[in-house]
């Protein structure tokens, strides 16, 4: 299975840099079996069935993008930092630009209330130890940081105050992600309430999405690719809700690939169980899904592991047809783009 099997041409004009307003005005490509319909997210109330269960990732994106100053003697250098994940040795793993201007032991000052020491420096990233922890760190980061927009958006514009709302789900609870579970950005409170009134259930899980979600696949044989690890949790109550839905014949529908990867990790034994820890599950064609019946997700990058995941769910030829339709009909792609609802079979 070759990386080139997952390539496609995407016009740059289809890369969304702002979300639809309101959130539910985003377009929705409904693909059920061989059928494709052009709908909108607001139509989900008539698409989902009573007894369906949506699995939502309630992670909260932290303002992980920082700009600071490194002082060496009388020389100063402007440093841009993106936090990636908490480091096992303490502090945070981070990317920095320009990395070459930093040495272990040096301090980066981000604000009067927040500084960090370069504890370790690798070839592509570093480990930072901040001068604050706990609630004090969270408060200082909130003041000094900005939303860590994906590279394909950040290359086109800088983050602003509007992203603080746009790049956060309405049910975000547990801080720790440095990228949003973007399929969930399409939901607002009125839509959630309308779905609940229809008899659709909701289960919340937590997967702290890491910056590794944007890393390219660098091997031609995709089966040899190794995924980045991300921390997640499926509580006992969440596992019980999902199991009860399966037992009753309802559909389990993750909203986003992060929720899907987490519940499939928790069902590695064949049945969904409470689960907590790091997952590096890599889903590509040939994978046998254990609890997922359908998936709501945005449109993904060429040659990405997420495109491989949806190809595993729907089949490679079917995904090619779906993405060809999306491009021809001007669907907006990636994090702030439109959505798809992928239902195998039909």
Curated annotation (Swiss-Prot):
Its EC number is 2.4.99.17. GO terms for biological process: queuosine biosynthetic process; tRNA wobble guanine modification. GO terms for molecular function: S-adenosylmethionine:tRNA ribosyltransferase-isomerase activity. SUPFAM superfamilies: QueA-like (SSF111337). Keywords: Cytoplasm, Queuosine biosynthesis, S-adenosyl-L-methionine, Transferase. It catalyses: 7-aminomethyl-7-carbaguanosine(34) in tRNA + S-adenosyl-L-methionine = epoxyqueuosine(34) in tRNA + adenine + L-methionine + 2 H(+). Signal peptide: none annotated. It is found in: Cytoplasm. Belongs to the QueA family. Transfers and isomerizes the ribose moiety from AdoMet to the 7-aminomethyl group of 7-deazaguanine (preQ1-tRNA) to give epoxyqueuosine (oQ-tRNA). Monomer. This is S-adenosylmethionine:tRNA ribosyltransferase-isomerase.
């Amino acid at each position: 299975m070759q990386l080139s099997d997952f390539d496609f041409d995407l016009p740059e004009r289809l890369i969304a840099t702002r979300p639809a307003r309101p959130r539910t005005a985003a377009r929705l490509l409904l693909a059920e079996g061989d059928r494709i319909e052009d709908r909108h997210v607001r139509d989900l109330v008539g698409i989902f069935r009573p007894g369906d269960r949506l699995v939502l990732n309630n992670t909260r994106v932290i303002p992980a993008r920082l700009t600071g100053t490194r002082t060496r003697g009388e020389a100063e250098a402007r440093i841009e930092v993106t936090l990636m994940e908490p480091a096992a040795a303490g502090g945070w793993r981070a990317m920095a630009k320009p990395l070459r201007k930093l040495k272990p032991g040096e301090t980066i000052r981000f604000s009067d209330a927040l500084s960090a020491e370069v504890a370790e420096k690798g070839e592509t990233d570093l480990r930072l130890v901040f001068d604050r922890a706990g609630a004090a760190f969270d408060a200082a980061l909130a003041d000094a940081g900005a939303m860590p927009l994906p590279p394909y958006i950040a290359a086109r514009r800088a983050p602003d105050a509007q992203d603080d709302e746009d790049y956060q789900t309405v049910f975000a609870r547990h801080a720790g992600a440095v990228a949003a579970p973007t399929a969930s950005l399409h939901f607002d409170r009125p839509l959630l309430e309308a779905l609940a009134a229809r008899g659709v259930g909701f289960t919340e899980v937590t997967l702290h999405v890491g910056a590794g979600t944007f890393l390219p696949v660098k091997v031609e044989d995709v089966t040899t690719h190794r995924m980045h690890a991300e921390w997640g949790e499926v509580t006992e109550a969440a596992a019980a809700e999902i199991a009860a839905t399966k037992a009753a014949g309802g559909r389990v529908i993750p909203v986003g690939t992060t929720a899907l990867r987490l519940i499939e990790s928790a069902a590695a034994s064949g049945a969904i169980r409470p689960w907590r820890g790091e997952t590096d599950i890599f889903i590509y064609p040939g994978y046998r899904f254990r609890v997922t019946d359908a998936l709501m997700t945005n449109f993904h990058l060429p040659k990405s592991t997420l495109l491989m995941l949806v190809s595993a769910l729907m089949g490679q030829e079917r995904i090619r047809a779906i993405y060809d339709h999306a491009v021809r009909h001007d669907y907006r792609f990636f994090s702030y783009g439109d959505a798809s609802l992928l239902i195998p079979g039909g």
